[in-house]
Amino acid sequence: MLDHRLAPEYEDLRRTVAEFAHDVVAPKIGEYYEHDEFPYEIIAEMGRMGLFGLPFPEEYGGMGGDYLALCLVLEELARVDSSVAITLEAAVSLGAMPIHRYGTEEQKRTWLPRLCSGEMLGAFGLTEPEGGSDAGATRTTARYDEATDEWVINGSKCFITNAGTEITGLVTVAALTLSREEGAEGSPTREISTIIVPSGTPGFTASKKYSKVGWNASDTRELSFTDCRVPAANLLGEAGRGYAQFLRILDEGRIAIAALATGLAQGCVDESLSYAAQRRAFGRPIGANQAIQFKIADMEMRAHTSRLAWYHAASRLQAGERFKKEAAIAKLHSSEAAVTNAREATQIHGGYGFMNEYPVARMWRDSKILEIGEGTSEVQRMLIARELGMTYS
């Protein structure tokens, strides 16, 4: 029998972050959204709280926590705002986790302390204009230059979170590497590897921020690499293992996104309950109408089942058990729950739900990307079917 009751230390963490989200994030985030500004002040406070180092060992500047703790934090943050939550999720799951999981001891000691403190943000350069769901279709190349013992990177990436802030310190880039060995027919062997590219490296450029429908307070950019040279020692893990690396990273990240989506879904419940109690029509609160009650009951059900799904996936991850299917289920269910809850919350608010000053308008805009980022809903269904042993052509 599954027991998803949280230990006291997790409940304490949840309460602390919930208070932070309510007292610090909520009063300020609307202004950041209005001006498409990155919330440096909020991010700095999150760094002081140790949130960026939650799942990492203390020897590297982390808090010695685990992935469950990170996901609890993401849920509580997203209950108020998703931009702040995705900044943390991408910085930890995509920026720091690959280095912790696959880096050399020198790479860990060079980068992790600053990433864990929040002094520096990391990003993961995977998606390309012609390679989103088909991540194996990477066209960015990294050629090894024996004369200088460097990788020379050329190509572009798109939709990369945390890629161009004032505190972005690195991007881990997935690239097609040409190995030093000759192929069977005399041509270089082609393989995907991941390489750490520090910000400010000549030939590495982050474009202007995208103008997005949602997540307006997060940083998302296109990256370009033109004869960008980095030391050979910046290779993350073994050459040719990049594809396997980012598949594992994405599997873990889906649990984090599921927690974030659950938070947004629950936030829609919170806002709808409050509005339904205050808004009066026909002489009584609209919450007295069964139609509104049923909507909110269904919204709570979706948020609750989403939470159970990501709890289960996270528990399997931490137990060292296979979790690919459970992560896909959690990501799929919670993201679709978030989209539905945001739509219903907007409907409950009526015309006010279409006004930017109401949080549900922001939640509505923020929700759709959850069905796309870190694996579309279609890809999640494909993964679930594959884990069930089904084949496809």
Which residues are covered by each model-predicted region?
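Flexible, glycine-rich active-site loops centered on histidine and acidic residues
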Residues: A96-Y102, F124, G136, R180
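Short Ser/Thr-interspersed hydrophobic loop/turn segments at strand-loop and sheet-helix junctions
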Residues: G50, L74-A78, A175-T177, V197-P202, ...
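A short core secondary-structure module
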Residues: E150, N154-T205
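Alpha-helical interface subdomain recognition
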Residues: M1-A90, Y102-Q107, R114-E119, D134, ...
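Long, acidic (Asp/Glu-rich), low-complexity accessory segments flanking structured domains
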Residues: L223, D227-A244
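Short Gly/Pro-enriched turn/cap motifs at secondary-structure boundaries
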Residues: L88, L115, E130-S133, T161-E166, ...
